Amino acid sequence: MILTEPSPLFAALLIVLAYLIGCVPFAVVVSKLMGLKDPRSYGSKNPGATNVLRTGNKTAAALTLLGDAAKGWFALWLALKLAPGLSSLGYGLVLIAVFLGHLYPVSLGFKGGKGVATALGVLFAVSPWLALATVATWLLVAVVTRYSSLAALVAAFLAPVYYFFGGGTIWPLNAPTAAALVGVSALLFYRHSANIDRLIKGKESRIGSKKA
């Protein structure tokens, strides 16, 4: 069923669906399928690609990254596919919902990942150019510092800034999406609070290191 102008009830269902899509724990699923330990049992205990990489299995980490990013993109793509006339407010709520699904998934007792890959996925849905600018920022900081968390924080801070300044020229600009992206950025900082503390104390693990 495709609705050009979705009813409030259908829009609400799309938001719930986005949350459930976000709940798919790719780090746990990929690790189980590949015979690896549950990522919640080692390293940072975070079910995300960076922690999976600590096993030394780059394929598992890459699949986790792709899966977590894809669900962010897919939730927004599906919402517009089912309801092309979805309002900008509805779109912004779907964006936040899939992100919250990853952070607080019912499938893992509301204890999910930190959201970097899923945030990347929603940025690709908003605009591939916006996502590429954010990825370039992450790569630059990561290569220079070898801190994945610091790279994520810098990219998270700048993504809404990029959206605002490029809006209306490179990609469409609207207030609900801008607010949603600011919300995603704030949540990323909140989820990285422990990393921020370790960065300040000089105890944060660098990319490629193994944490027992």
From Swiss-Prot:
Q: What is its main location?
A: membrane
**What chemistry does it catalyse, as a reaction equation?**
an acyl phosphate + sn-glycerol 3-phosphate = a 1-acyl-sn-glycero-3-phosphate + phosphate
Keyword Methyltransferase listed? no
Q: Which residues cross the membrane?
A: 10-30, 90-110, 124-144, 150-170, 171-191
Q: Does the keyword Protein biosynthesis apply?
A: no
User: GO terms for CC?
Assistant: plasma membrane
E.C. number(s) listed in UniProt = 2.3.1.275
Pathway listed for it is: Lipid metabolism; phospholipid metabolism
Q: Name one GO molecular function term.
A: acyl-phosphate glycerol-3-phosphate acyltransferase activity
HAMAP family reported in the protein's UniProt record: PlsY
Q: How does it assemble?
A: Probably interacts with PlsX.
Q: Which family does it belong to?
A: Belongs to the PlsY family.
Q: What is this protein called?
A: Glycerol-3-phosphate acyltransferase
Instruction: Record the organism.
Output: Bordetella avium (strain 197N)
